[in-house]
Amino acid sequence: MSSRDSAASEITPEVLLRAYACGIFPMAESADDPGLFWVEPEQRGIFPLEALRISSRLARTVRSDRYRITIDTAFERVLGECAAPAPGREDTWINNRIRKLYSGLFEIGHCHSIEAWDGDDLAGGLYGVSLGGAFFGESMFHRSRDTSKVALVHLAARLIIGGFTLLDTQFVTDHLRSLGATEVPRRKYRALLDRALQLPGDFFALPADRPVSGADVLAIVRGTTAT
């Protein structure tokens, strides 16, 4: 379900958080369209944190620490990269109003980015909204192979350690499905969301000021001990 709403012109970061708590989120038709509309999918995409699919190749890449992972150090750049055209994605739903709103959420501590660096180059990353024990993944990008996937694995580990129970992807693409994303009906999603919102999720329970090795991240996600 989606609806255009004249009240969209009155959206603030605080209103946006209340909307997320109700299971709805805003989108734009395109990056050039100044309007916004509310969306509440009949089938909601989620990532079961205990069922993230990590291929052998991806596991090797994560374990190698080839890409340096940082948290919240380049939020605006990640947002800009997610909004930019890319091969197979000539247009996006991230317009200037979306960028301003989520930058506002970042300023008050409810939006976060995970960056994957190849040397000094920002090679991939993702951003999303944190509320209670729920994390709403908004968008990701990659400039090098598997960098967005590596960022996702690091995100999953951070959410598990932080006591989160819901990783919302909003919609499921073939790419996300290959990583373990699935769809649930709106009623089940709301129940999952309501439970998650009661939890005091801590996005920084896993330290952000020092590196976490890929081996440790894989151990967290797989529920094992790093070797």
UniProtKB/Swiss-Prot annotation:
GO terms for molecular function: leucyl-tRNA--protein transferase activity. It is found in: Cytoplasm. GO terms for biological process: protein catabolic process. Belongs to the L/F-transferase family. This is Leucyl/phenylalanyl-tRNA--protein transferase. Pfam families: Leu_Phe_trans (PF03588). One of its GO terms (cellular component) is cytoplasm. Functions in the N-end rule pathway of protein degradation where it conjugates Leu, Phe and, less efficiently, Met from aminoacyl-tRNAs to the N-termini of proteins containing an N-terminal arginine or lysine. NCBIfam families: aat. Its EC number is 2.3.2.6. Keywords: Acyltransferase, Cytoplasm, Transferase. It catalyses: N-terminal L-lysyl-[protein] + L-leucyl-tRNA(Leu) = N-terminal L-leucyl-L-lysyl-[protein] + tRNA(Leu) + H(+); N-terminal L-arginyl-[protein] + L-leucyl-tRNA(Leu) = N-terminal L-leucyl-L-arginyl-[protein] + tRNA(Leu) + H(+); L-phenylalanyl-tRNA(Phe) + an N-terminal L-alpha-aminoacyl-[protein] = an N-terminal L-phenylalanyl-L-alpha-aminoacyl-[protein] + tRNA(Phe).
